[in-house]
Amino acid sequence: MKNFISILSIFIIVSCSSGKTPVEEGLESQILHWGNGSEPQGIDPHIVTGVPEHHILIGVCEGLTITDPKGGRENLPGVAESWTLKEDQKTYVFNFNPNARWSNGDRVTPEDFVWSWQRALTPTLGSQYSEMLFYVKNAKKFYDGEINDFSEVGVKAISDYELEVELENQTPFFVGLLAHYSTWPVHKETVLKFGEMDDRSMKWTRPGNHVCNG
């Protein structure tokens, strides 16, 4: 008898439930349900370091290049729809996708990357992946305080749609590094609206504040 009552109770509970899957509920409410495994520490690409954060960032942000989602080794276009390597084999010119946009509608520009890389290389921000950019000419010198003028670092917006990056040495794998979230851009106006360039509070990433480009 007890078993019958237990089974009946389960049947009633199941019958009273909506029966909708998370996917169905998401489609109905237009809310993305993401099974991330664990709580992220944040979503500032220049501060976070973990896998849970990475899983979220690749869904909402984009760098100059992206990794092949099918597992291929080729670097695929991201914000940069194409790029060229000059004869010195150290200088890249990235050509931006004119349709690349921030979530607030602003166009993603080469200057966004210049400012973002300066932020990532600012020691007081404490980015644990700043060395990813040390392949760029004078980037380590700026990080170490040997130079203070960021214009001496080898990253420049040479037009509204072109970013030039000069490296210290020939680095064939550099384009692949640009798919790592620590090299991705952040929205300057939004970051500065909620703090300084090197503010680690991540207020700019909170709900209602966050602007992304993915």
Report the location of each language-model feature.
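Gly/Pro-rich hinge or "lid" segments in bacterial periplasmic/extracellular proteins
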Residues: P69-K70, L167-G214
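Sec-dependent signal peptide recognition
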Residues: K2-S9
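C-terminal motif of bacterial Sec signal peptides marking the signal peptidase cleavage site
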Residues: V14-S15
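N-terminal lobe/hinge region of extracytoplasmic solute-binding protein
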Residues: G35-E87, V211-N213
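Solvent-exposed, polar/charged alpha-helical surfaces in well-ordered, non-transmembrane soluble domains
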Residues: Q41, I58, E62, E81, ...
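Immediate post-signal peptide segment of exported/extracytoplasmic ligand-binding proteins
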Residues: V23-H33
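Aromatic- and charge-enriched surface segment that lines or borders ligand/interaction sites
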Residues: S82-Y129, E164
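Sec-exported extracytoplasmic/periplasmic mature domains
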Residues: T65, P69, D88, R101, ...
